[in-house]
Amino acid sequence: MAELKQLYIFTDGSCLGNPGPGGYGVVMKYKHQQHEIADGFSLTTNNRMELLAPIIALETLYEPCNIILTSDSQYMRQGIMTWIHGWKKKGWITSTKQPVKNVDLWKRLDAVSQLHKIDWHWVKGHAGHIENERCDVLARKAAEAKPQQVDTGYNPE
């Protein structure tokens, strides 16, 4: 079996108002190459953007990879590493017997992450981590750009 390519992915989400206009930012590194992705939505939440960032990054890959994925979102990291197993067993119901919020994105993240070997890392936001700061700028600019794109999965309660 061929050795998997080693990638480093950094992600962040931003929302102005929460809910409000939102965006995500991604920095992907492979060897000496760096690629950035960002996009915005007219109405969404911070948590949805924190989930969408790694989804978009992973969906751009065309082959299985060994990935170190770094985010400042404990919600995303805890969810994909710990909570999701119970949610799936209970039919996407939380421990408090409520439907899992953002289930559309959790299902996408679960599916796309199965294709890769991923180490999920957390970094404190706004603490000077170069790639996290860059993702924050990308996400904020995408949110501030008056995006017209609709987050079809956003469901205000």
UniProtKB/Swiss-Prot annotation:
Binds 1 Mg(2+) ion per subunit. May bind a second metal ion at a regulatory site, or after substrate binding. Keywords: Cytoplasm, Endonuclease, Hydrolase, Magnesium, Metal-binding, Nuclease. Pfam families: RNase_H. Residues 3-144 form the RNase H type-1 domain. One of its GO terms (molecular function) is RNA-DNA hybrid ribonuclease activity. GO terms for biological process: DNA replication, removal of RNA primer. Transmembrane segments: none annotated. The keyword NADP does not apply. Its EC number is 3.1.26.4. Endonuclease that specifically degrades the RNA of RNA-DNA hybrids. Belongs to the RNase H family. This is Ribonuclease H. It comes from Shewanella frigidimarina (strain NCIMB 400). The gene is rnhA.
